[in-house]
Design a protein with these regions (language model features):
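N-terminal entrance/gating region of PLP-dependent enzymes' catalytic architecture
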Residues: 1-58
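Conserved PLP-enzyme active-site core in the AAT-like
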Residues: 5, 81-246, 315, 332, ...
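Flexible, glycine/charged-enriched surface loops at secondary-structure junctions
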Residues: 10-13, 71-74, 123-126, 291-296, ...
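Gly-rich Lys/Arg/Thr-decorated short loops/hinges at beta-loop-alpha junctions or inter-strand turns
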Residues: 35-46, 64-68, 94-95, 116-124, ...
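Short loop-beta-helix segment that forms the pyridoxal 5′-phosphate
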Residues: 44-48, 64-84
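Conserved C-terminal alpha-helix-loop-beta "cap" of PLP-dependent enzymes
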Residues: 290-373
Length: 383
């Protein structure tokens, strides 16, 4: 209790950078807490695990609908390992170089770099220009013909919306595979990764019903075209019929997994992610397509409202002029003073960057809090 009392709970959160304070329907925390689901058991024995297997199958189905892909796995630990595992899926004997956008989340870049080091592959970072992936730099890096896969984040770390379709065309023209790391809430209104030409779709699933809490537990979603199905890591639940002709669920393509291939398996994901996948499935079911789109629209509208208000203050400028979803960067002085003043007002301000602040707004932020934030920034800068 004493340690918990040291936690600071803000009434308004204007910080994102990979972890987002979205509305979570009340039902989301109750269903995963049922004793039928709350278990560390891995559902290897299908005849004893139909409920858990069905919940994972439904999660996979919803991820495929969200991304437009053909097949999804039962998730991995979080978004950064998902991107790294996707890079491993792209590897072949002749192409041992992976590219990742310099506008991707720094933690994702570092995680992919760690995985590449372990496999002896090389990671090269595509320079960013005006807050987005530089297409000319991408072409130059692809010219050598040694790139196996390219990872682009949409929206990127700075909140900017990449021209995902055009980048995909450049990548495929060079014979490389296209990994699109995307925000699942943004997919409520943006084109799907499949429509953008991606071969593999990954992302951080935390916005899908998982609360903020010291970085976890989260989940990383992964989906791919059927051509790459056998390279997906972790468990895949499939639907079939039993000896009586009744529908049932089983673990499919198990020869890929660690309990059979051991050290040759593509991952060692075990039971922990089933509960997070169930949480995401319940969230998506509760919100529905319309609810998810509404959350995305409100988040985008409130972020743009905040951006306009801040940009109208003398001394504050938007760092990038491109379109953004629900995050943006402002250049401004007195960062520490601004964030301290916001904290005094029970508002967690944006993430401090060099010379600026990365702001985020979700559907949970009331307009009054946005107006108050704008007023506080204006007051601090007027002194």
């Amino acid at each position: 209790t004493e340690l918990a009392g040291e936690n600071r709970v803000f009434s308004t959160i204007l910080r994102g950078a990979g972890a987002y304070a979205h509305y979570i329907p009340s039902i989301v925390k109750y269903i995963p807490a049922k004793e039928e689901f709350l278990t560390a058991y891995t559902p290897y024995q299908a005849e004893l695990s139909q409920g858990i297997l069905q919940s994972i199958f439904e999660y996979q189905t919803m991820i495929c609908e969200l991304t437009g892909m053909d097949v999804s796995n039962a998730s991995v630990y979080d978004g950064a390992p998902a991107a790294a595992a996707a890079a491993a899926m792209c590897r072949d004997r002749k192409r041992r170089v992976t590219l990742i956008s310099g506008a991707a989340h720094p933690d994702v870049i570092n995680t992919v770099r760690t995985y590449c080091y372990g496999t002896g592959d090389e990671l090269r970072v595509i320079p960013a220009k005006d807050g987005k992936t530089d297409p000319d730099a991408l072409r130059a890096l692809l010219a050598a013909g040694d790139v196996s896969g390219v990872c682009i984040q949409q929206p990127n770390f700075f909140g900017q919306l990449e021209d995902a379709e055009a980048l995909g065309e450049i990548i495929h023209a060079a014979g490389a595979l296209y990994i699109l790391s995307c925000n699942p809430i943004a997919l409520g209104i943006l084109k799907t990764p499949k429509e953008c030409g991606a071969d593999i779709a990954v992302g951080e699933g935390q916005p899908l019903g998982m609360p903020l809490g010291w970085g976890g537990p989260y989940l990383g979603f992964m989906a791919a075209t059927s051509k790459h199905m056998r390279k997906l890591p972790g468990r895949i639940v499939g639907q079939t019929v039993d000896s009586h002709g009744e529908r049932c669920f089983v673990l499919s393509l198990q020869a890929r997994e660690q309990h059979i291939r051991r050290e040759k398996a593509s991952s060692n994901i075990c039971s922990n992610e089933a509960l997070c996948a169930l949480t995401a499935g319940v969230y998506l079911s509760a919100m529905g397509p319309e609810g998810l789109a509404e959350a995305a629209r409100q988040s985008m509208a409130k972020a743009h409202y905040l951006a306009r208000g801040l940009a109208a203050i003398e001394g504050v400028t938007l760092r990038y002029s491109g379109e953004f979803f629900h995050e943006f960067v402002t250049d401004l002085p007195k960062q520490d003073e601004i964030l301290a003043a916001l904290e005094q007002a029970d508002i967690l301000g944006g993430l401090p960057l060099e010379g600026g602040i990365l702001w985020c707004a979700t559907e949970k932020v009331p307009r009054e809090a946005l107006d108050r934030t704008i007023a506080i920034v204006k007051e601090v800068l007027s002194k």
